[in-house]
Swiss-Prot record:
Gene3D superfamilies: 2.10.70.80, 3.30.60.270, Immunoglobulins, YVTN repeat-like/Quinoprotein amine dehydrogenase
Cleavage (site feature) positions: R69, S70, R119, A120, R1030, S1031
Tissues in which the UniProt entry reports expression: Detected on neurons in the caudate region. Detected on neurons in the hippocampus (at protein level). Highly expressed in brain and kidney. Detected at low levels in heart, liver, small intestine, skeletal muscle and thymus.
Protein name: VPS10 domain-containing receptor SorCS2
Species, as recorded: Homo sapiens (Human)
Amino acid sequence: MAHRGPSRASKGPGPTARAPSPGAPPPPRSPRSRPLLLLLLLLGACGAAGRSPEPGRLGPHAQLTRVPRSPPAGRAEPGGGEDRQARGTEPGAPGPSPGPAPGPGEDGAPAAGYRRWERAAPLAGVASRAQVSLISTSFVLKGDATHNQAMVHWTGENSSVILILTKYYHADMGKVLESSLWRSSDFGTSYTKLTLQPGVTTVIDNFYICPTNKRKVILVSSSLSDRDQSLFLSADEGATFQKQPIPFFVETLIFHPKEEDKVLAYTKESKLYVSSDLGKKWTLLQERVTKDHVFWSVSGVDADPDLVHVEAQDLGGDFRYVTCAIHNCSEKMLTAPFAGPIDHGSLTVQDDYIFFKATSANQTKYYVSYRRNEFVLMKLPKYALPKDLQIISTDESQVFVAVQEWYQMDTYNLYQSDPRGVRYALVLQDVRSSRQAEESVLIDILEVRGVKGVFLANQKIDGKVMTLITYNKGRDWDYLRPPSMDMNGKPTNCKPPDCHLHLHLRWADNPYVSGTVHTKDTAPGLIMGAGNLGSQLVEYKEEMYITSDCGHTWRQVFEEEHHILYLDHGGVIVAIKDTSIPLKILKFSVDEGLTWSTHNFTSTSVFVDGLLSEPGDETLVMTVFGHISFRSDWELVKVDFRPSFSRQCGEEDYSSWELSNLQGDRCIMGQQRSFRKRKSTSWCIKGRSFTSALTSRVCECRDSDFLCDYGFERSSSSESSTNKCSANFWFNPLSPPDDCALGQTYTSSLGYRKVVSNVCEGGVDMQQSQVQLQCPLTPPRGLQVSIQGEAVAVRPGEDVLFVVRQEQGDVLTTKYQVDLGDGFKAMYVNLTLTGEPIRHRYESPGIYRVSVRAENTAGHDEAVLFVQVNSPLQALYLEVVPVIGLNQEVNLTAVLLPLNPNLTVFYWWIGHSLQPLLSLDNSVTTRFSDTGDVRVTVQAACGNSVLQDSRVLRVLDQFQVMPLQFSKELDAYNPNTPEWREDVGLVVTRLLSKETSVPQELLVTVVKPGLPTLADLYVLLPPPRPTRKRSLSSDKRLAAIQQVLNAQKISFLLRGGVRVLVALRDTGTGAEQLGGGGGYWAVVVLFVIGLFAAGAFILYKFKRKRPGRTVYAQMHNEKEQEMTSPVSHSEDVQGAVQGNHSGVVLSINSREMHSYLVS
């Protein structure tokens, strides 16, 4: 949650006091390949061209960013450091610029007949262009040609001092490499380059101006090596500076809004420091602070002026809202106004309100506190289901919010609150939005400054964007009326309802369109912006329109977008074309845009980067910032309109105009308001003391002064009365509010409430029939029990904090029966009122049922939570036979330590499948229908503990298995761990390969779990040759292996000199041969030693009819839990198996798992 509000008068510290808030305006875009990007961040309510400052943000300086631009051909570099004064010549005199003069009104040269003006004697009651006499003074900042950024501060408030910081910012390195600080004490006529440390190169990163005493300035300086940082402090508008080393690196400074010497420093290490003597001494306040979410106390709301509101991260990683006084901000003195964690970057303190959001169990809730009372949920319509919420404005004891509801993508709905900021009603749907850099959101709505209650908004429906205006804070909206004639006096042929005027408000889809509407507090009713006529807003049309009666009538003034600046309360409007070519003239109007004149402000065309006037727009002096080429120095041109006006305005110089909406109704927001404006025939200065408001008269209340209350919506236009508010289907107006406590009273809503800040009296009162009712005793509803931190799995012996919440119902008379599932039972009162958690500790693993029953005489509710208490998993081993027969059933077994029956979930990935098999058992059975290598992966998850193991299996259609046994001495040394079994299998395989010359890759020895220690030897067949029907090499390999085993040639040593002998296990058969699934099974008979050759031939000839001692087995696909051989001749034949066999079934009941088992 962040502020994304429209422009309005500032109330808090300026941007030099703190970094731009989330609601700060976005950086302006360069119009159409314009190589210089103007970023205006003015320190006072200064009149710089560009976007208006945000609420709570003053504009102390202008930052200009220079990017490469092709220099115009034939331009000479200007001289630097000297003044160049130029007065306009007489009409008709030759202009200073070479080349043919363009036509009237064209930029780049003055229009014919207007190249210079001299002041003539004032004519009584008559204004004439002959009276205009402007003085332009140019100054070049010599030596700063390489600097690509500039920050400008005009102190204002009867001061003639201007400070300019130019710097070379290296984007790749992310820091400033060079800088220069210039100071003017004559309104910008001349500048002096300041030397902060004689003989030492000083790099200034930024400067900050105190909003309450703009004579006080702080410069932030750093070394190129980034090893140290210093501040330079001034209390005389930069005439002198005092160096102050600091032990941290400043990210931004935040001045106190009322006390000039108090300042906060947010560092690059996310630490917060405070100084009470303008930066001379610093004290650490807090660490792990969220940037841009630090706020000073609000005057008139916070009791302690030294209070600081902070969003900070605690040691557990959660973000908290905390407050403390700057003189004592230790951990013991921190106050947490909200007990739980909040979402990162959501804290906003603004005027009477504090906002944040908190997400738990995948549900986000938005909270508000009015005038520092307890936090309550913001009540939006029940099924708004907001995806995002942005604060638009908070002035006049009311909150405007933009809510992106569940179905919206690039639009928001606008809601208006009651004075407490709790209950919200819809005022406008589908306001256009845009997501900018760093995930910031801009809502296309603008508050018109100078006249309260007036807003402009761009609504997007079915892809079409149209501009709307309201005069009563969103109660009613209308389209802008188009002008009947264009700037050339031709008919526009634009008639409602098919055609209206549409304006770019705050941004545009085209990044080269500024999309700015210009309004000022000092010029009420004067609105100027870029847009077009038509059925919808066109992003690339930027015609300039102006109104002087607050949007009632509009006029077109230019065909292209211009930079706009208001001087002398709007008495002079200055415009410079927003273009990528160099300019030398400006346009100005002294009659609210009815007529325009041009002035040649420099003899050499310059690329204009921006305009700036003294804060408050109350003077007639302005500065144009620019440069002749990218490689040239910065050039500042001071334009002084004061010689054109000889006197101050008197009462006879003003006329009045009355505010009205588009229907002609003059009772707006419950009053008739009239304003003063200078007559077009008067040639005088309004001056600093001018006030525009003239008179106001309270009106009688009408139904239009009321809007729909929370839970109600206005009827559609098809119904008889469009002003009727009807209850939504989910809202029962007769039900007491959720926070209605026994003994209190509440007002049943009739569906209407008066528009906040509407001052009408008498007349219609649509709330007069409201009835005060006693809050009844209500049963508890929405009871919830959870573990603090949202975990439901804990470890034995760990402290668990149970939190009980109740959304509705009485809490004072309700009793709470708590059963924690392990024998602990208790009865509580005021459990949900205090919010104190219940601390408990489970000693034994298991699943515990936690229940809370809330009951009073009106009813009851119950909440249940199942808590898993388990030890973390230590080891996981996937036990599986490495060789599998085609289409044979095989067991995959996960050996887990420690065993957690009924608490562990196993995830099995077989082959390339992304979808796992889930089981609560530690083993599964499967089959493989294709030969090749198959990877099997298992994950065991128990609570927050997850382990994984993986194995590669070979799926073959032919292989032999020979059962093995070991001498009994081995059992005493068998720890029954997977690693030990693998090592024994490897040594047996290696010895057999060495003694028989059978390739080691064709032998696999698998030692079975448990005692006695047994093993199976897998003899793999090489790939068959295409021309070979049957090979006897397999028989020879088996005979060789049997021979070395019978000869007791395979043995290995254990510790202590114990030798272990490996032999064939007596199963009644020597070996089994497994064939492919589609052919017949053939097994070679072991030749009996000593038989005659003829006997051997006869036995081989009739081997299909005489079973002998060889087992002829076929592949069986039936499932066998223990996977023993399907063909057995005795009880001992269980060891002679086919592709799936008993060696896969793990048995660990005879020996405990060793502690060094790892996954």
